[in-house]
Amino acid sequence: MITRRSFLGSAAGLALTPGVRAAESAKKKLAVVTNIWNYRSHAWHMAERFLHGYPIGGAWHHPPFEVVSAYVDQKPEGDLSAARAKEFGFTIYPTVEEALRRGGKQLAVDAVLVIGEHGTYPKTEFGQIQYPRYEYFKKITGVYKADGRTAPVFNDKHLSWKFAWAKEMVDLSKGMKFGFCAGSSLPVTWRMPAVDLPFGAEVEEAMCVSNGALDIYDFHNLEAIQCMVERRKGGETGVVAVQAFKGDDVWKHVSQGDWGKELFGACLSRSHTLAQAPTLSHRMPTWDQMKEWVKEPVAYRVEYADGLKTTMMLMNGLVSDFTFAAKLKGDPKPLSTLFHLPPTPNVTYSAALMSKAEETFLTGKSPTPIERTLLTSGITEAGLQSLKKGQRLETPHLAVKYQVGKESTFARE
């Protein structure tokens, strides 16, 4: 695990290297593959951490990587890729393959950062944006196969909008034996309070409440839930069914206590953005107020193979943050926390995520389980399909089993 001490050590080592040019040449080479590179896009938030560094533990860290190439799929108005390439001296290539080979005939980078988010892409009938993450990955691994060498890969957010493709990506990474890290910033950002699910705890019910759009924030919400419940007794057992709800059905199940009424209350009590009526100070809203403010609540009810049930809730108009609560066996009080997302423009939670990408690039191993994001990618797909079809969906294909270590991996400094 990368720590402040190791960050400062690497930065100090670079500072002692004679000559800036020599220090740069000693750095590992990084290729960026991204949909777009615009202001406040994920490339702007994440790839640029490897251009000018980022804060960690009260110090400014400069990763021992040099961005040497990029592929930018779309260049809408406001594109910043050319300006960044000129400022930092990297080359933008017309294809993924050329970016990885840097115009030559062999793989010429030590790591690949994939950011398949934002841009204009078609949607499926279920509202899934068909971002080309799988297509990027296949081109990357095509280079690896042809050139007889691999490099670690970080993939931002979902693996793919199609679970079969997501599974193929994971299987390929394991078969070719290269480090593969992916997912949301939610599991690795700061928490208030800084708690984790006790390792090996028996979990009866869990919930995360947030705002946001479908196929975007539902994934973040599910990643927040999964990074907690995967620590439960027996480890991850996979998901057997998903059912989506919206509108009055959500309020009915919450108010009747079907989904853990006390967990909903704990989540709202952890929120820093809980909506209030005009002129009122911080109060717990009434059910009538919540129904008035949240025009169309959405929930995914997720059933796990070991009997655990979790609820993903999108409550636009009620909150603008992510809060989690869980009922642990033998504990009358829910475990609860806020996943803290520092504000724009700096959004330093992306720095926390890029520290995991950097660790993957340096060690060749992901510090977080790729199976987590495989599973959450599949739950997101199932949730959107259930919402469209209006029925519970059994998910035998989501029998994703894995174990995590005892050590926590979220930001604390």
Predicted regions and their residues:
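N-terminal secretory signal peptides and thylakoid transit peptides that target proteins
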Residues: 1-15
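Non-transmembrane alpha-helical segments in soluble domains
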Residues: 8, 47, 51, 82, ...
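N-terminal glycine-/serine-/threonine-rich beta1-alpha1-beta2 phosphate-ribose binding loop
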Residues: 12, 22-151, 161, 165-168, ...
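C-terminal helix-rich "cap/oligomerization" subdomain common to oxidoreductases
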Residues: 13-16, 25, 127-129, 284, ...
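An acidic- and aromatic-residue-enriched active-site/binding cleft used to recognize and process polar
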Residues: 30, 117, 158-159, 183-186, ...
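Short, surface-exposed amphipathic charged segments that create phosphate/polyanion-binding patches used
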Residues: 109-110, 195-199, 220-224, 254-264, ...
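NAD(P)-dinucleotide binding in Rossmann-like oxidoreductases
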Residues: 278-372
